[in-house]
Amino acid sequence: MQLLMLAAYRSEKYKKSVKFLFPSSIAAYGMPNLKVKQKAGTVKEEEWDIPHTMYGCNKLYCEKLGMYYSQYFGQKHLDEKPPVMLDFRALRFPGLISAFTLPSGGTSDYGPEMLHAAAQGNRYSCFVRADTKISFMAMPDAIKSLLMLMDAPVKSLSSRVYNVAAFAITAEDFRQRAVNAFPGAKISFEINPRRQGIVDSWPEDIDDARARTDWGWKPDYDVDRFFDDYFLPEIRKRYSLVGSH
């Protein structure tokens, strides 16, 4: 809030709108149960914004604050000559995966954790069901989307908050990729009810048509290119060094 207030005051004082870019998350969504999630399929930005976690609540809260400071700050939009307000823009990211950093225990990290374990010849117990499905994205695409939204002309934007998507796959899809890449990988499914409940509250996929239309969003990495050209080559490099020093 402090940063938003500062940006809003500077926009008004210097009569030039400050761009404020915020990384939001699919955690801002909240589906009531698995049946509703599966029926909903691909979800738009304004649908099912009822998060089940404190993390998701805070992401949604920041989105709403950004909208307020961009449009209604102090109700000054009602003035005869409204001041210049800040230019808030947010991206709702899916599960982000980097080939260069280790997964750190996030709720969507079961996929990369599985592959890191398989590459090292370690057993892995996945904490969600095999059929669990959500959207994921390669880190280079996440960076690309941030830069694209930052550079987009304000006149082309129809929203303050945009979904961006790349590919949606199941935990079983990750397991199959791990087994194919590292034969003999030992992966089981041991469900953690609380973590499963969180992932079940997130949509299977997100609709990013608005971003594609408004500012030309398109990911570089589909599911095959993500694994074959980005993630697996770097994982192999990382663990080929184990024990070599």
Where are these regions (language model features)?
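Hydrophobic structural elements of the Rossmann-like NAD(P)H-binding subdomain
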Residues: 21-23, 80, 91
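Glycine/proline-rich active-site loop of Rossmann-fold NAD(P)-dependent oxidoreductases
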Residues: 60, 84, 96-112, 139-140, ...
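C-terminal substrate-binding subdomain of Rossmann-fold SDR/epimerase-dehydratase oxidoreductases
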Residues: 122, 127-129, 135-245
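A conserved pocket-lining segment of Rossmann-fold NAD(P)-dependent short-chain dehydrogenase/reductase
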Residues: 46-50, 77, 90-105, 113-137
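Active-site Tyr-X1-5-Lys
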Residues: 31-35, 50-89, 118-120
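Conserved active-site helix of classical SDR/Rossmann-fold NAD(P)-dependent CH-OH oxidoreductases
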Residues: 2-3, 60-67, 71, 111-112, ...
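Conserved sequence/active-site signature of Rossmann-fold short-chain dehydrogenase/reductase
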Residues: 26-29, 96-98, 142, 169
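Conserved Rossmann-fold NAD(P)-dependent oxidoreductase catalytic core, especially the SDR/UDP-sugar
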Residues: 3-54
